[in-house]
Amino acid sequence: MKYEAVIGLEVHAELLTESKIFCGCTTKFGGEPNTHVCPVCLGLPGTLPVLNKKVVEYAVRAGLALNCTIANFSKMDRKNYFYPDLPKAYQISQYDLPLCSNGYVEIEVDGKVKKIGIKRIHIEEDAGKLLHENTDGSLVDYNRAGVPLIEIVSEPDMSTPEEAYQYLTKLKSILEYTEVSDCKMQEGSLRVDTNVSVRPVGSTELGTKIELKNLNSFRAVQKALEYEIKRQIKVLEEGGTIVQETRRWNEAKGITEPMRTKEEAHDYRYFPEPDLVPIIVTDEWKEEIRKSLPEMPHRKRERFISEYGLPEYDAKIITSSKKIADFFEKCALEYDSPKAVSNWLMGEFSRLMNETGKEIDEVPVTPQMLVKLLKLIDNGVISGSIAKTVFEEMFGTGKEPEVIVEEKGLKQIANEDELREIIKKVIAENPKSVEDYKNGKEKAMGFLVGQVMKATKGKANPQLTNQILKEELSK
């Protein structure tokens, strides 16, 4: 029997408001433990919450960008459970009347477009953070308690780990473009829970659902799903049954492990939050927010293709991140070869960002600096290969490219007489390759060019090198 997977995702995104959802405490990441707190977010007796209007606005922005219906009337609810990181012993969330519902995003997998439904988006407060650094017990940091979140719940419309990965990538891109969240998984501002089950191909009944946690990257989501789908199919093929539970992804072992049996919604004893009035979103306010939405990724991609002549692949990669798209456009306005800019962004820039774990706005290289580097290549001051060395130094130090070229003596050798002397020496030292070239072996030319580059430490002008080599070899 063949099986297929059914996947749904729950994404929690911290909102980029300056203050928390029900009080005036800062939402800044990285403060000393328990310094961004007050009686309200600590849930002390006698305190009352006041809903931050910006939270509603940002949630509506996200909802509109994700093609949702925005509720004119919604309310907050108490979700009751006890855990040390939850100071009130309940979380203020939304239950039966979410702010946004019935949305969708379109993803592209294997050249085909698929629509993934979004069941709901609701607002809620974040919990604190448990720190297990001490063997004698755990510590709680309440700085995060009360930070505003939106929870985006997809329909179970995904059937492969690749679809889940593409959905998350698209969702992150839209949240960044709307400036609703910075989506930094390493800081916990984007968190993903995955629900997955398997069923016989062609069946309409859903299988037993497993929730996966501890997923700290989109690739981890993909790997965890790949493993979990295989595990569930194996259990069923061996005549076993799937137990509804929450499982943890163990990155080191590459497996999922049981955490706890899955709670149902009624375990939380939801009831309306008595200390907050209902949320009213008027049509006028909704329209005002809609008009403030920026250019979305798919529109920007189309524009980059038509306006800058980028290939579709380049435009898709560049526009997947708002920060990279903005960087590209600043370069393209100052430099007349947009394709060269995209090559650098997708090549050396991307490689070094991946190696260092930095985002483009955390790197000391500005668009103006990259343009200067490209112009140094165009003007024959440095070669393309030397430019990579210069760029690495720029990336690490923030120095201007011309300063690095001067300091390290990297200027290209473009003096014909100087280069001819070096080439004559290379020819004299490699008679076998010279003979091979004269006998029609084109590869020998590549070897000789390489020897010239080696002798000049990569500083020989490539075009001039080829020209002089051919002249000398024809003598």
Swiss-Prot record:
It comes from the Bacteria. SUPFAM superfamilies: GatB/YqeY motif, Glutamine synthetase/guanido kinase. Gene3D superfamilies: 1.10.10.410, GatB domain, N-terminal subdomain (1.10.150.380). The keyword Iron-sulfur does not apply. Its EC number is 6.3.5.-. GO terms for molecular function: asparaginyl-tRNA synthase (glutamine-hydrolyzing) activity; ATP binding; glutaminyl-tRNA synthase (glutamine-hydrolyzing) activity. It catalyses: L-glutamyl-tRNA(Gln) + L-glutamine + ATP + H2O = L-glutaminyl-tRNA(Gln) + L-glutamate + ADP + phosphate + H(+); L-aspartyl-tRNA(Asn) + L-glutamine + ATP + H2O = L-asparaginyl-tRNA(Asn) + L-glutamate + ADP + phosphate + 2 H(+). Keywords: ATP-binding, Ligase, Nucleotide-binding, Protein biosynthesis. One of its GO terms (biological process) is glutaminyl-tRNAGln biosynthesis via transamidation. InterPro entries: Asn/Gln-tRNA_amidoTrfase_suB/E, Asn/Gln-tRNA_Trfase_suB/E_cat, Asn/Gln_amidotransferase, Asn/Gln_tRNA_amidoTrase-B-like, GatB, GatB_C_1, GatB_Yqey_C_2, Gln-tRNA_amidoTrfase_suB_CS. It is an enzyme of class 6 (ligase). It holds the Pfam family GatB_N. Belongs to the GatB/GatE family. GatB subfamily. Heterotrimer of A, B and C subunits. NCBIfam families: gatB, PRK05477.1-2, PRK05477.1-4, PRK05477.1-5. Allows the formation of correctly charged Asn-tRNA(Asn) or Gln-tRNA(Gln) through the transamidation of misacylated Asp-tRNA(Asn) or Glu-tRNA(Gln) in organisms which lack either or both of asparaginyl-tRNA or glutaminyl-tRNA synthetases. The reaction takes place in the presence of glutamine and ATP through an activated phospho-Asp-tRNA(Asn) or phospho-Glu-tRNA(Gln). This is Aspartyl/glutamyl-tRNA(Asn/Gln) amidotransferase subunit B. It comes from Thermoanaerobacter sp. (strain X514). The lineage of its organism: Bacteria, Bacillati, Bacillota, Clostridia, Thermoanaerobacterales.
